Structures are given as structure tokens and as C-alpha cells.
Amino acid sequence: MWRLRIGAEARQDPHLFTTNNFAGRQIWEFDANGGSPEELAEVEEARLNFANNKSRFKASPDLFWRRQFLREKKFEQKIPRVRIEDAEKITYEDAKTALRRGVLYYAACQANDGHWPSEVSGSMFLDAPFVICLYITGHLEKIFTLEHVKELLRYMYNTQNEDGGWGLDVESHSVMFCTVLNYICLRILGVEPDHDGQKSACARARKWILDHGGATYAPMVAKAWLSVLGVYDWSGCKPLPPEIWMLPSFSPINGGTLWIYIRDLLMGMSYLYGKKFVATPTALILQLREELYPQPYSKIIWSKARNRCAKEDLLYPKSFGQDLFWEGVHMLSENIINRWPLNKFVRQRALRTTMELVHYHDETTHYITGACVAKPFHMLACWVEDPDGDYFKKHLARVPDFIWIAEDGLKFQLMGMQSWNAALSLQVMLAANMDDEIRSTLIKGYDFLKQSQISENPQGDHLKMFRDITKGGWTFQDREQGLPISDGTAESIECCIHFHRMPSEFIGEKMDVEKLYDAVNFLIYLQSDNGGMPVWEPAPGKKWLEWLSPVEHVENTVVEQEYLECTGSVIAGLVCFKKEFPDHRPKEIEKLIKKGLKYIEDLQMPDGSWYGNWGVCFTYGTLFAVRGLAAAGKTFGNSEAIRRAVQFILNTQNAEGGWGESALSCPNKKYIPSKGNVTNVVNTGQAMMVLLIGGQMERDPSPVHRAAKVLINSQLDIGDFPQQERRGIYMNMLLHYPTYRNMFSLWALALYTNALRLLVS
């Protein structure tokens, strides 16, 4: 039976190192003798329920770890479930009861180190690169047991589309990118090309690939993986010359200009490209060469495939001028720099420089790297440099950090969300006004935040190594990943301020005030001239560089951007900080808030909404915008922006009283209701919060009562809420954040309960 181990509970590896006793680390381990017959039957029932209902909801409820924690804590839901017939007759006691049920359940889901575990999945191009890398390096069977393989195959089968392909995420149409990578993944894991049982997964996938032109129509990142495996030729790839890391700082584009994740990704890719590394051919590799193309492998003209991309993948088409630019880069890279004598001087020096950067970034992120997309490239680059070296072994030790097990199988996560989950979950707990009932939850959560703050900048000359300041920030994941984010830092500040106000006798040792100052300093440093807040690093403002992007399936990948949600969170966090510590950099904070407010107001859409970059989509964005505006003193009475936002939310409420937004809103950049305008509890919680923050209860509470009825009646017997469509997103890729169903539903109910209490009093 699979069990989730937290922090130092997990089996240790001599190549792991930690700065905070592995706080937040989440590792799945299989216990062959674990689980009672009842528990094992419960696991199989959960798998069957998911498989039977995946045509309706493709996101798993992520129940395995929750049930494990509830058993370990002997949690029983003793509060009777509330059912509402008439929304207009909801009482304070009804709302408080539903809130307490949900909060006590969710508190029981807290890990012993203070965070709330969760998978962060959905992208269907994350699994195969790890499998390919481990296959090439000969470590597949050392990392993957038979149980791992069984669960990974389960996930592949569960997420395959009816037409045989796989989409960018589990809810989207099939694309060459994910279909060709997952086909290779299945073959490496031992699935036969034609006779693989009733599912015929490989046969169906291969038909899709060949019907759409073959693997030469895969996008850039997929071509790189095909090339290192030896089932594609590097000459058919867009150039990724390692010399980019030698460009001077005054160059319009250099390593420091790049967006942090494309920088991380290109480091490993460019080293492998510069080396033209190809795995030693095996019988399987030779078979794949024949299976992936409609024509003989030896007859493919690779140079003509360089700019090819299947129309299903080409969400952001490239112009003739862009293709011409990349042809020029290819000519410079391969016909000049990579020819004697320059290859002996420039290329070799560039490769050494690239690996110095790879090692630096790996060390400063504890070999977690920026995220799942970059890690296998870094890991393979380290193996190519030295198969027996410690760098590669340190990478292997961190592979389990990316694995997640749920009812739908095993998948590799994009990254963890430990700190983000903790900050938002604690805000929910604090809003519930149940401090005495959940004191231990608050203490553990506060301790986790204190352990998770980054206390120093990256070692050495970090700017030379293309790393910016980090001191004072919180990451999305855990402290050891080392890449702080603005919104997560702001949300953590707000939590810590609330805890700072509590008596030490209740909450324990307080965070050093200087550490809060460090966090605020980090946020002030990040703000752009336009008032917006980027996520990770100061935005360079060179948005014209996006024209150079070689990536076909997503936009805005070259340089850091400003984001609405980050700006709203930062304003809310700094307003809270300013009230408690008015003497720390007051002018800079006031300036940041003023510029941030204008940035938010300028982004408002004609219908009163805001576009959300990190969630689905206009409902999510509108919540973070209104929350930031309201924190700074804007109200329905004095702010046209809030009035328009409230009207947008009222206009999109469905007949049931809830909200449900289609993920199509994100790529189309206009509000689209869910199919049939069906309610989603996450969207409903977010929209209800907008109305409550916007003072709707004082004008006409009926829409809020109707929304509350939806949430209260949606609550399950245990106190959980139903898992519906995925509500996380980045660009056009849906991400699975299962804890959102608890956080936003309970946060809305907490605000609603407080509003009812004020009406009663």
C-alpha cells in the first residue's frame, strides 16, 4: 500500500542535503505489507470510482493521502451535515456549522510539519522525460519498482484520449508533443506496440501520431528529447547554442534577461545540444525509429523538419520572419561556431560555462531545480558530463520529490505547492474565527512558515550566475527549492502578521521582526515601473523579445512578466504589514501600493472582470484584484472598479446560485461559462468572496445567500467538498490544485459566517 511520508520521515539518501530538516518534503513509499483488508479495498474502490467517472471529471480527488492522514489522526466527523432548502432562511448557526465541519476536516488533513500536502499535476509532458532520462542513464529499474511502473501505466491509460492521443493537459485535445512522448514512455515501460491487451494504448497512439504526419511534427522540447534518445536527429531541431550563456550583460538578450524557467530549461537543453549527445542505440530505440514515422527513418530530411509543428500543437504560430531568424541562428551556431577552429575555443568554453551554471542552479535549488520540466534535462546533462559523479547522484536522490500517487495513478508533478498551500490554508483558518478549536493547527502552520522562509541570497556571485536576490521570500514549494515568489511571500506575510498579534502563550515563539522586514524588502525590490508585480524576479520590460520565442504551445516564455494576482496579493500583504509596522520604509510601501492600485485598475476588462493568469480565470483574477483594492481602502461606494467587478460577478451567477467558468476562458481571453453553466465549487467560493468583500450583503444579500446554499449543500458527509474540473492554470495548460476545493469554499463560508454574525448582532 502506498503511503505519503513527510519531511525527515522519508527514507534518506546520503546525497541529500537540507537546510531545514526537510520541512515540506513529500515522498510516496510503497509498503508491500501495509494496509488492512478494509484499507486496501477502499483504495481499489477509489481507483474504480475515478475510472468510472473520468469522462465527467478528469481530475482525481487526491484521496489517498487524505484518508491516510485521517486514519492516523483517528478523525471522525461528529458534526451533522447541514442541508439548506430556502437560501433566504440560512441562519448564522447553519453557516457556522457548515464552516466548522469543513475547517475541522481540513485541519485534520494538515501534515505534522504544518503544511497541507497536495498534488500539482495535469500537464501531460512531465512523465516521459524522467522515464527517458532514467532509461538512457541505466537507472530506470533502480528508481522505479514494479509498483511504480504499475501506477505510471495506470496514469497513462487513464489520461489517454478517445482518439488515442494525449493533450497538453488531461482535459484538452490531443497534441503531438504529449502523444509522441507518452508513446515512447509506454514502450520503455514494456508495453508492446500492438498487442498490449484490451486497451491497445500503443497501437491507438501510434495511429494518431502517423495520421498527423509523424514525430517530425513534434514541437521543440519534444524534439530535444527524441534527439537525445536517438529517435530523431539534432539537425532537425531549432538551435539551442550554449554560447548564449557567454553573451555580455549589455547584450539585449542574455542569460539574466530570460524568464527564470526558460533559463533553467535551456541550460540543460543547450548543453546536450552543444554536445550533440545521443544515447547508445538499443533494440528498442531502433524499433522506435521505425514506429514513429510514416517514412523510413533513413529517408527523413531533417533540415526540412526543423520548423515543423503539428497544427494541434501550434497554438502560437511562428511567422516567416521568425523561422528565418532561427535558420540564421542555426547557420551561425553549426556552420561557424561549431566548425574548426572555433569549436575548439568558443564551443568548448561555452559548454564548460553552461555546466558551471547548471551545477550552480542545481546546488542552490537542492537539485529540485526550478520545476519538473527542467530537472530531467539537468540530470541528463550531469550524467553526460560524469556518469559516476556526485552531481548526477544528487539529482537521482531528488527524483522522488516529484512523484505523486493518487487514484488515477502515478504522475510527475510540475512542482510542489507546500508554502502556497500553507499560506492560503492558514488564511482560511484565521478567517474562520475558530482559534481555540484549531490552536494546534495554527501553531504547526506558523512553525512551517517560519521554517520555510528563505534566510539568505544564493551563495557567491549570484548575479553573475543569473540568480537574483531571494532573502526574505517564500517559494511556491518549500524553502529548499529556493525560488521565492511575490504572491506567496505576500500571503505568508499576512499570515505572520496575524500570528504576531496573538499572545505568545497561545501561538508560541514569534517570528523575528527583522525577517518580516526582509520579506517586505524583497517585495519592494520586485515591483516594476508600471506598478505590476512579477512572480520571481524583476521584469526586464523587454517584451519585444517574446518575438524570438521558439516555443510553439505557450506564450510569454522569454522574459518575466507582471501579473494581476501577484499585484493584488502584494497590496493586501503590505497594507496588513503597514498597520502593524508603520515605521518600516513607509514611503516605499505607500508608493508601491499606489502604483499597484493603478496597475490593477488599468487592467480591468470592459465587462468589469480581470483576466487571471494562474487560475480559471476571470473569476479567479477578479477575486485577487478586488481583494487588493479593498485592502487599500477601496469600496463599492468609492471605487468604480469594485462596482463594475461586483456587477460582473452578479451577471455571471447561474440559475442554481453558483458559478462555473470554462477553462476555455484562458486561451480565448474572454469569459466563457462552463458547459451547461454547471456550478464549480471553487469558482463559486471565489465569486462569493468578491461579493462579500464588495459589500453585497449590505445592499442585496440574496445572491450571496444563494451562493452559500450551493456551497453548504455541496459539502460531503466527511466535511470535504467534491472534486470537479481543474481550476489551476498557466497560460493554456490546466493544472490540478485539489486543495482549492477546500480553501476557496471554506474561505467564502468564513467571510459569509462573519457577515451573518454582524447582522445578528
UniProtKB/Swiss-Prot annotation:
The keyword Isomerase applies. The active site is at D487 (proton donor). Its EC number is 5.4.99.53. It catalyses: (S)-2,3-epoxysqualene = marneral. PFTB repeats lie at residues 149-190, 516-568, 642-683. Keywords: Isomerase, Repeat. GO terms for biological process: triterpenoid biosynthetic process. InterPro entries: SQ_cyclase_C (IPR032696), SQ_cyclase_N (IPR032697), Squalene_cyclase (IPR018333), Terpene_synthase_CS (IPR002365), Terpenoid_cyclase/PrenylTrfase (IPR008930). PANTHER family: ARABIDIOL SYNTHASE-RELATED, TERPENE CYCLASE/MUTASE FAMILY MEMBER. Converts oxidosqualene to marneral. Belongs to the terpene cyclase/mutase family. This is Marneral synthase. It comes from Arabidopsis thaliana.
